[in-house]
Structures are given as C-alpha cells and as structure tokens.
C-alpha cells in the first residue's frame, strides 16, 4: 500500500473515530491519537525520511494536507462540543423562579451596640452632640490634658497598653473631652461613645476591651445640681423605672469633686448576689471638671464650669438584662446573642 493509499485510509478511520466523540475528553483523546507525539502522523514522518528525494516534496505535501484536514475538522468539532457543554451547564444552573424562595436569616444588633445606641439617644434628647476620637491616642490627650500626674498609676504599663513611649490605646473616651475643649469654646455639650482598652485580667467582671460613654457640659454657671439632675433623668429613662441614686465621694484626676454613682438594686435592699447584699449597684463615675483641665484648653475656670460623667456600656447591659458574666458579650455564642436581637 502506497503512502497516498495509507493517508486515504487514515481519513476514513478518522471519520469513524470522530463519530464516536461526544465530549471534550473524547475529543482530546482523538487528537492525541492522530496528532500526538506518538500518534499516527509520527509514523508518516518516519516514512517520509526513507522516500526517494524526488518524491519527498509530493508525498510531504500530501501528508501535510491530510494533517491540516484533520486539524480543521477537530477545531470545528471542538466548537460544537464546547457550545453543547456550555448549554448543558447552563441548564444545570438554571433557577426555577416559580419555586417559593427561602428567607435569608436576618441579623440583628449586638446587645452592646443596642445598649450603646440607647444611651447615646437619651443624651441626644437632652441636647448633647455626638463626638468621637481615635482608639489610638497620644499620651498627652489621654492623660496629660486631663490632669493625670506623670507618676499616676494609670500611666504605667501594667494598666495601659503602650504602642510606643508616647502613644497608647485609649483607656477611656475622655480623650474626646481633651480634644473638644481645645477645639471649641463654651458652651460645649458632648456625648462620646467608643471602645476602650485596659491591661486587666479577663474575668466575669472585667475585660481588656470594653465600651464607654462619656458626657460633659461646659458653660457659665454649670453646677453640681445640674450633674445630679442629668444623672437622675438619664437612669430613669434608661431603666424605664424610677431608681434611687446614691453618690459617694471618689477621686478622678480630671474632676473635683469626684463621685461614684450607685443605683438601688431591684432586690430593694433585701440583698442579692448581684449587689453583693448591699442593696446598691455602682454604675458611673462623675464630677465637676477640674479647673486644670479647663486651663489646659485655654478656658477660664473663673468664668466657666462644667461636669463630666462616664459609664461602662457592658456594666449597664449586665444590670439591665441580668447578665452575670462580661465575657458573654465577646464569645459569639448565638444562643446568647439571639436573646437580644
């Protein structure tokens, strides 16, 4: 059999093989069979080398023509198979829009976010403006401008996270006070929500991160009675009931006098584990803004006065909803969180 006859037989065999191709894999296998390194046309290349010189051009042209024919047919077949497989894939992914849909699960506010918003909303109703400051703060804004002495324990690394010798993670939202008083002249009435950080052991009552709201008011003739009236009104609205407040003298560098605020426990003095059988629950620290803080902001303490108060949001949430462990707020336990969403 001559090479020409062999090429014709290859064409016929190729046509038979092509009729059995139904997928991309079948097509790939067929291509390897005829055009691969060990395929049928490899044998023709070997035969061509043994042909007489005067016949090589003619026979070589015939081999190339047959090979080109097979390549063109394979290309056409690949386009047909690709279109077919894409259509099949489309049908697999097709969505029946007539079927009833499935409701996506809805999220809800985290309890801390909910309580934080409730607290801020109450102060906004009282005429306060919302202001924020960065979590990463200079030691100056976090301590110095708020009348913290250089050797105050709060400045030490065992209590505060230092990023470098003069930069800290803020320990309170009072850094808003130092910024706002330096930027705005009285009257100033601001509520400042945010996240705070302290180097403490994590327990049922404390955490290294917590949320705080600070509120402060500076104007002429602001008095201690304005502070107590504000506190009384706030807690009455927040807890939805009349609560008795108790004020205890305390020390905070940025206020003078300073007080700690307690509210009456729901046990009404009978004593329970929540109030440690005292009948009272600590809820805030407050006081009249220290004259040194006003002077640092170039505000004359002889002309202006003001009060400041700060409260922990986790503490308020625990009291309002009867939660005994602060760690529950950050453990992402949906069984706990869904009770409040």
Swiss-Prot record:
The keyword Protein biosynthesis applies. It is an enzyme of class 6 (ligase). The keyword Protein biosynthesis applies. Its cofactor is Mg(2+). Keywords: Aminoacyl-tRNA synthetase, ATP-binding, Cytoplasm, Ligase, Magnesium, Metal-binding, Nucleotide-binding, Protein biosynthesis. One of its GO terms (biological process) is phenylalanyl-tRNA aminoacylation. GO terms for cellular component: cytoplasm. Binds 2 magnesium ions per tetramer. Its EC number is 6.1.1.20. It catalyses: tRNA(Phe) + L-phenylalanine + ATP = L-phenylalanyl-tRNA(Phe) + AMP + diphosphate + H(+). Belongs to the class-II aminoacyl-tRNA synthetase family. Phe-tRNA synthetase alpha subunit type 1 subfamily. Tetramer of two alpha and two beta subunits. This is Phenylalanine--tRNA ligase alpha subunit. The lineage of its organism: Bacteria, Pseudomonadati, Chlamydiota, Chlamydiia, Chlamydiales.
């Amino acid at each position: 059999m001559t090479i020409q006859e062999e090429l014709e037989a290859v064409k016929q065999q190729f046509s038979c093989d092509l009729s059995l191709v139904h997928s991309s894999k079948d097509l790939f296998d067929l291509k390897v069979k005829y055009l691969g390194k060990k395929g049928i046309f490899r044998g023709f290349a070997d035969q061509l080398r043994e042909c007489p010189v005067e016949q090589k051009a003619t026979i070589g042209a015939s081999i190339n023509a047959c090979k080109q024919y097979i390549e063109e047919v394979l290309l056409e077949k690949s386009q047909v198979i690709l279109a077919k497989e894409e259509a099949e894939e489309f049908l697999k992914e097709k969505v029946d829009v007539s079927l009833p849909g499935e409701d996506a699960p809805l999220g809800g506010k985290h309890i801390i976010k909910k309580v934080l918003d409730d607290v801020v909303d109450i102060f906004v109703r009282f005429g306060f403006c919302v202001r924020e400051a960065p979590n990463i703060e200079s030691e100056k804004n976090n301590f110095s401008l708020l009348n913290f002495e250089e050797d105050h324990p709060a400045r030490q690394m065992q209590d505060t996270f230092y990023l470098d010798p003069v930069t800290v993670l803020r320990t309170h939202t009072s850094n808003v006070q130092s910024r706002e008083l330096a930027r705005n002249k009285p009257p100033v009435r601001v509520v400042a929500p945010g996240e705070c950080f302290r180097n403490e052991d994590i327990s049922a009552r404390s955490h290294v991160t917590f949320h705080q709201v600070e509120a402060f008011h500076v104007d002429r003739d602001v008095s201690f009675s304005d502070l107590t009236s504000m506190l009384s009104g706030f807690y009455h609205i927040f807890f939805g009931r009349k609560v008795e407040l108790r004020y205890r003298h305390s020390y905070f560098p940025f206020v003078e006098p300073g007080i700690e605020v307690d509210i009456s426990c729901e046990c009404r003095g009978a004593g329970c584990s929540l109030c440690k059988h005292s009948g009272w629950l600590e809820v805030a620290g407050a006081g009249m803004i220290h004259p040194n803080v006003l002077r640092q902001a170039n505000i004359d303490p002889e002309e202006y006065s003001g009060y400041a108060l700060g409260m922990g949001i986790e503490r308020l949430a625990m009291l309002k909803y009867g939660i005994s462990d602060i760690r529950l707020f950050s453990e992402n336990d949906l069984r706990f969180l869904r009770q409040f969403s």
